[in-house]
């Protein structure tokens, strides 16, 4: 899988016969299979298909965006004409989302003119021939009149199907997304260039390629998505096993997805060497579930799309045939009854708009023994709230940037967000409101609710938790009150995240609250600029000017400090963290912590010798790493290796049998007086997807966090999680003379749990706090000389009074009616202050005061010799 490309090319075969003196040369062309393309060959092939397209259809190539390394993300579109695309995007799609009942009536009356998009997609770029299948299908639909394939009916009888492409284009628009990961195609990688898996990121959306694809999916809302993967030898075609996510309207999609999968499987088998296929929902009891929106195919199901992951068996021409014909079999199924497909979609949207909770959807939600468990309502009469409110007011304990980011997130994902236009009960004007009476309420709820506890199941495929509010650190409240905000919602007008907006000019310093990732970014920016940054027990101390300079770029919360810090200042930190190595894929990948820390402004280095701090997240280290630098051990894999090495006497990392990938979000209790827990409250949360805890704490080590004694498990998949009560999850101490921090969870997993990043950054910055000394403000001058402008006679000095309220950040200039400029009287970066921690200072005199004196709180009017005259007060 990693090395086959090394053999591609022309190779000379030389045969000699010494007796006869004969030499025979033959050139052998090595290619993986007949329809194989390199990335560059694929780009050339799709351009050629466009150029050779039939004149009776519209064939386009669209660049959706750029990959992380700057490669184009290409998508082919085949439609009847431009009018078909325009009508779908401007009429059919928006009407379906907002007025599905009207479309249902027209559909029933046979008066509805519509076309449905179909998306053929690849996520994992090295799972060839996936990309080649899409490349070949694009050529077929662009340049051919008909396409014929063999298949069988339900009884196994052989038959031949011919699809007339112009006829298909009367009902469908075909989208060919050649690959989500062009970097991976060029470099022969399954993962993105940063080592992260795009097929776990469809809901997290931390990567640019994924965000681009998600935006495209929600632009088109295709009726079906065929996501070509490899390699499952049994030739796997979804739908998936239970547990199914309760936010689906699964009963509307289930039968259609099963029928579609059978049509695909029968066509794939009939045209290849393979003699069978499997459908996880029918053939496996668990372990290939659709409870997580991170998979591209499953993500589609949340939006009423027939989403299918297709796992071809091998990387060869036979799998090319199987995958290609499976997609053709799926298209044939769609073509048999498009009205039925559209009816399903419209009913899906209608349930959201009408806030319908149909019992039939609950009947699809089963437990491990097949029993119906339905939607967990926690004592309420219904599952879906009427609204979600995301507060946008300034709040020290709310990550304002992450709250603000949800505006773009929901827009990208087709969820409507409004803004509260007046205070209503505890909710404030300007708060974001998601009215759940909308087409995509299921996905909105999936992102904002706590999540489900699927610990009763014996197996799950990967992560389960999404829960953006808890995982990313912003507040969100479900509201069960129908009509509460009627007439009070409008379009979102806020253009940036909330942050401190007033600065006290008397405060020499500010404390940046350590309650957001933005705070860490801002602090690293200040350190990089050579500013003095001090550590305190609840944040970072910077001088007032530095704080003001950070506010335009960072959504941070600051408290005025009327003290003077003394002690060590923070320095730029270099971090070393060994890569992961995945034997099954034959690749290395960066530690997730490295990716996160780089975004937060830390420098990542390649050796421990270069580093200031070592972070161990994988098991790729030995005993020699310890005792040289402050070290962090993060997650179950690294903890198990630490115990195995035996270098930390008395340390015991524990897990349940088979539990190395158990996942859970839990309530925890921390030592909130320790600097390493800065920014977190005593009753907090803990997240892990590596199933470990600390059973024994070494002597002289301090316990920083433990799971709560009861009622602690919130969501995830952690069988027998009842054993976790009071278990230790974080400790600190020293090993071989260096600080050692051990954290059992995974605070940077796939870059999603932003709220937990600061467990890592706290340990990096350490616990050497500044001491605080009294601040002695400089004595104000007795007088301020204000020059008189626009005078024809000799001006005389005028005494002016200086008010000292809070000073707002710079505002726009105001202009009077006669167009004379009057500058808003605001604080400016660089306004001086005097600090006197060590010795008394002589008071400044009026002679040292500059003529450019910044006044605030009153208007200085200068026109035709008129002045406001005030006497200076001595404080």
Residue ranges and their predicted role:
Residues 96-258:
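Active-site/substrate-binding loop(s) of hydrolase catalytic cores
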Residues 862-875:
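C-terminal membrane-anchoring or membrane-association module
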């Amino acid at each position: 899988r990693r090395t086959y490309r090394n053999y591609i090319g022309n190779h000379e075969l030389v045969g000699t016969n010494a007796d006869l003196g004969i030499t025979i040369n033959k050139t052998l062309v090595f290619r993986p299979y007949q329809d194989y393309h390199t990335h560059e060959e694929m780009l050339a092939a799709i351009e050629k298909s466009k150029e050779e397209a039939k004149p009776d259809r519209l064939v386009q190539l669209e660049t959706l965006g750029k990959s992380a390394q700057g490669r184009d993300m290409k998508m082919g579109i085949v439609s009847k004409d431009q009018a078909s695309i325009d009508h779908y995007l401007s009429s059919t799609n928006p009407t379906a989302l907002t007025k599905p009942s009207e479309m249902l009536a027209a559909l029933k009356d046979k008066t509805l003119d519509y076309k449905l998009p179909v998306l053929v997609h690849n996520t994992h770029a090295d799972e060839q021939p996936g990309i080649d299948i899409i490349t070949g299908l694009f050529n077929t639909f662009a340049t051919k009149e008909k396409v014929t394939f063999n298949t069988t009916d339900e009884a196994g009888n052989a038959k031949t199907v011919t699809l007339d492409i112009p006829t298909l284009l009367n009902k469908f628009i075909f989208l060919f997304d050649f690959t989500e990961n062009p970097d991976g195609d060029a470099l022969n990688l399954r993962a993105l260039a940063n080592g992260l898996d795009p097929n776990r990121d469809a809901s997290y959306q931390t990567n640019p390629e994924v965000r681009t694809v998600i935006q495209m999916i929600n632009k088109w809302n295709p009726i079906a998505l065929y996501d070509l993967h490899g390699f499952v030898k049994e030739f796997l075609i979804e739908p998936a096993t239970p547990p199914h996510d309760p936010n689906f309207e699964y009963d509307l999609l289930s039968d259609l997805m099963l029928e579609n999968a059978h049509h695909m499987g029968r066509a794939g088998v009939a045209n290849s060497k393979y003699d069978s296929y499997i459908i996880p929902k029918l053939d496996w009891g668990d372990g290939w579930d659709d409870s997580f929106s991170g998979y591209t195919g499953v993500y589609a199901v949340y939006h009423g799309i027939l989403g299918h992951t297709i796992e071809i068996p091998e990387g060869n021409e036979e799998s090319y045939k199987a995958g290609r014909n499976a997609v053709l079999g799926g298209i044939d199924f769609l073509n048999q009854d498009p009205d039925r497909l559209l009816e399903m979609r419209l009913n899906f949207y209608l349930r959201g708009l009408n806030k319908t909770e149909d019992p039939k959807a609950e009947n699809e939600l089963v437990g491990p023994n097949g029993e119906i468990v339905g939607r967990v309502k926690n004592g309420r009469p219904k599952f879906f709230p009427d609204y979600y409110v995301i507060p946008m007011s300034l709040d020290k304990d709310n990550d304002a940037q992450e709250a603000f980011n949800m505006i773009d997130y929901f827009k990208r994902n087709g969820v409507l967000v409004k803004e509260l236009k007046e205070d209503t009960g505890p909710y404030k004007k300007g708060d974001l409101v998601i009215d759940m009476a909308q087409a995509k309420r299921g996905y909105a709820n999936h992102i904002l609710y706590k999540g489900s506890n699927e610990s009763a199941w014996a197996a799950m495929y990967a992560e389960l938790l999404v829960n953006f509010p808890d995982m990313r650190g912003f507040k969100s409240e479900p509201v069960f009150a129908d009509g509460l905000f009627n007439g009070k919602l409008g379009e979102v007008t806020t253009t940036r995240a909330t942050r401190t907006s007033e600065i006290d000019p008397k405060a020499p310093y500010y404390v940046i609250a350590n309650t957001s990732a933005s705070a860490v970014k801002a602090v690293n920016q200040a350190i990089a600029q050579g500013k003095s940054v001090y550590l305190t027990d609840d944040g970072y101390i910077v001088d007032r000017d530095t704080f003001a300079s950070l506010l335009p770029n960072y959504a941070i919360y600051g408290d005025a400090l009327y003290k003077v810090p003394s002690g060590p200042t923070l320095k730029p930190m270099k971090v070393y963290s060994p890569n992961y190595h995945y034997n099954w894929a034959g690749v290395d990948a960066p530690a997730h912590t490295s990716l996160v820390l780089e975004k937060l402004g830390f420098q990542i280095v390649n050796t421990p010798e270069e580093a200031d701090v070592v972070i161990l997240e994988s098991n790729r280290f030995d005993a020699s790493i310890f005792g040289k630098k402050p070290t962090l051990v993060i997650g179950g894999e690294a903890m198990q290796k630490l115990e195995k090495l035996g270098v930390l006497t008395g340390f015991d990392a524990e897990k349940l049998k088979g539990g190395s990938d158990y996942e859970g979000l839990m309530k925890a209790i921390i030592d909130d007086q320790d600097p390493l827990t800065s920014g977190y409250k005593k009753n907090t949360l803990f997240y892990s997807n590596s199933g470990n805890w600390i059973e024994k704490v070494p002597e002289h080590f301090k316990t920083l966090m433990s799971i709560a004694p009861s009622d602690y498990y919130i969501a995830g998949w952690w069988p027998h999680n009842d054993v976790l009560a009071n278990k230790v999850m974080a400790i600190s101490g020293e090993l071989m003379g260096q600080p050692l921090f051990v954290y059992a969870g995974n605070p940077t997993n796939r870059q999603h749990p932003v709220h937990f990043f600061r467990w890592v950054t706290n340990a990096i910055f350490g616990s050497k706090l500044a001491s605080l000394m009294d601040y002695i403000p400089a004595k104000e001058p007795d007088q301020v000389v204000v020059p008189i402008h626009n005078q024809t006679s000799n001006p005389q000095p005028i005494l002016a009074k200086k008010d000292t309220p809070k000073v707002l950040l710079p505002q726009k200039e105001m202009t009077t009616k006669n167009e004379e400029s009057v500058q808003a009287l605001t604080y400016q970066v660089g306004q001086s202050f005097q600090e006197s921690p060590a010795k008394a200072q002589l008071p400044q005199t009026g002679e040292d005061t500059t003529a450019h004196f910044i006044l605030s709180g009153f208007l200085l009017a200068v026109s035709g010799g008129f002045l406001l005259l005030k006497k200076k007060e001595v404080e």
